[in-house]
Swiss-Prot record:
Keyword S-adenosyl-L-methionine set for record: no
Record-linked InterPro entries: Rbsml_uL15_N (IPR027386), Ribosomal_uL15 (IPR030878), Ribosomal_uL15/eL18 (IPR021131), Ribosomal_uL15/eL18_sf (IPR036227), Ribosomal_uL15_CS (IPR001196)
Homology family: Belongs to the universal ribosomal protein uL15 family.
Species the sequence originates in: Pyrococcus horikoshii (strain ATCC 700860 / DSM 12428 / JCM 9974 / NBRC 100139 / OT-3)
Stated name of the protein: Large ribosomal subunit protein uL15
Name of the gene encoding the protein in the UniProt record: rpl15
GO biological process, one term: translation
Start and end residues of each stretch annotated as Disordered: 1-43
Description of how the protein assembles with itself and partners: Part of the 50S ribosomal subunit.
Tagged with keyword Thylakoid: no
Comp. bias intervals (Basic residues): 1-28
Lineage, broadest ranks: Archaea, Methanobacteriati, Methanobacteriota, Thermococci, Thermococcales
Amino acid sequence: MIRRRKKVRKLRGSHTHGWGCKKKHRGGGSKGGRGMAGTGKRNKSKWTWTIKYAPDHLGKRGFSRPPEVQRDVRIVTLKFIDEHLEDLLQMGIAYEEEGKIVVDTTQFADKVLGTGRLTRPLTIKAKAFSAKAEEKIKAAGGEVILA
């Protein structure tokens, strides 16, 4: 149980409640505004501070592309295909056909990129290939099929 009396009870009738001049205990107006108030285009009351410490505070830069224009291209690399070939065979993404291994990347990726190298000839089926990927697949004795 708190028994201490509020200080305000002692100060009843006091004009300023211990704050000196009445002006001194006003809100943000006596402090030049709250936060970044006054840093706008007009008047520029805090302009020197703004140009020194927050030069990017005003103005716009760049743009954001509309979501309907953006495309999320799922990629897979030759390195990934070569390293995970056994897993792909178990999952049914890759299969053997006429003694050749066919990898159908259309199930999990849109484009095959040429990072890494192939250690065996593979037939790779995809929606798109980079130029380097096509080159490396053919150099390894494989085949490229656009789906």
